[in-house]
A protein has these predicted regions:
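N-terminal, positively charged/glycine-rich alpha-helical extensions of SAM-dependent methyltransferases
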Residues: 1-36
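A short glycine-rich, Lys/Arg-flanked "PGG" loop and its adjoining helix->strand segment in the class I
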Residues: 139-153
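Class I SAM-dependent methyltransferase SAM/SAH-binding core
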Residues: 68-116
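A short SAM/SAH-binding and catalytic strip from SAM-dependent methyltransferases
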Residues: 125-137
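Substrate-binding/catalytic lobe of Class I Rossmann-like enzymes that use SAM or dcSAM, i.e.
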Residues: 167-257
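A short acidic, Gly/Pro-enriched loop at the edge of an enzyme's catalytic core
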Residues: 117-126
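Conserved alpha-helix/loop element of class I SAM-dependent methyltransferases that forms part
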Residues: 46-63
């Protein structure tokens, strides 16, 4: 089942979704909540992602019935919410997420951006798990208010920027103080919150570990070519320099120490006030 509002821009194509599912075998796209003694393995990552999902579900207020998952990814959260008796709907402007959701979850899907959505309303809870950062800040609470029942809830679990002068790390995520200011000026109040930055840290550590191994592997694989064809290697480097430099500049995004110094990953549950 599908519903949609007009999409003025080309539908997004989430290549990360395809990579995580098809290449890595991951059913979830979000960070994980790790235990202190967890090793950096694929199985531990999957368990951490499931723990994150369970944390969200356990945090749902009593009396909640109808739930909208904004940026529903692979549909795993909706699938488990439905199994627990909730009436769920998904929302995303991404064509791949739409396809995966249709294959996995028998529920209504809204093929649109949240800020452009024409929702009928009546939701008890809206969940934004790592999707709030993609929604214009001035639209987050405005559209949520229109879509929720009186005294409905907005659950945000995402990372925010603490330092706007931190280069690449400052480019993704809402400014933390601006987000809280926007919330304070809205019709919502915070009813619970938790800083989970320490819990998600190992997600970055395992990503950085994989990146190092990939770079080392690429170096080893090209070693003989570089030795035997130095001139051709210079040409290859020249053509691929911009992509290589971009990859290096973006590697900082998975540096756990720098991430935790510049960003804050927080769970915040808001309630709409009369």
């Amino acid at each position: 089942m599908s519903s949609s509002a007009p999409i003025t821009e080309k539908a997004k194509n989430d290549r990360a979704l395809r990579f995580y599912r098809d290449a890595l075998g991951l059913e979830r796209l979000h960070y994980g909540m790790w235990l202190p003694d967890d090793e950096l393995t694929m199985e531990a990552l999957k368990a951490a992602q499931k723990r994150y999902e369970d944390f969200l579900i356990d945090s749902i207020p009593e009396g909640t019935r109808r739930v909208l998952d904004v940026g529903c990814g692979t549909g795993e959260l909706c699938l488990h919410l439905k199994a627990q008796g909730y009436e769920v709907e998904g929302l995303s402007p991404d064509i791949n997420q739409k396809k995966v959701f249709a294959e996995k979850v028998e529920a209504l899907f809204h093929f649109t951006k949240f800020e452009d959505s024409q929702l009928e309303g009546g939701y008890d809870l809206i969940i934004m798990s790592e999707s709030c950062q993609y929604i214009p800040l001035d639209k987050v609470f405005e559209v949520a208010q229109q879509a929720l029942n009186p005294k409905g809830y907005l659950m945000v679990c995402d990372y925010f920027v603490l330092d706007q002068n931190a280069g690449e790390l400052s480019k993704s995520g809402h400014d933390y103080n601006e987000f809280l200011k926007e919330a304070e000026e809205s019709a919502f109040e915070i009813v619970s919150r938790r800083d989970i930055t320490p819990d998600i840290r190992k997600t970055l550590e395992i990503a950085d570990d994989w990146a190092e191994k990939i770079l080392l592997g690429a170096d080893i694989l090209t070693e003989k070519f570089r030795e035997r064809n130095p001139f051709l290697w210079k040409i290859v480097k020249w053509f691929g320099l911009s992509k290589y430099e971009k990859a290096l500049s973006q590697k900082v995004l998975i540096d756990a120490d720098k991430f935790c110094a510049v960003k804050k990953y927080e769970f915040i549950l808001f309630q709409l006030q009369p």
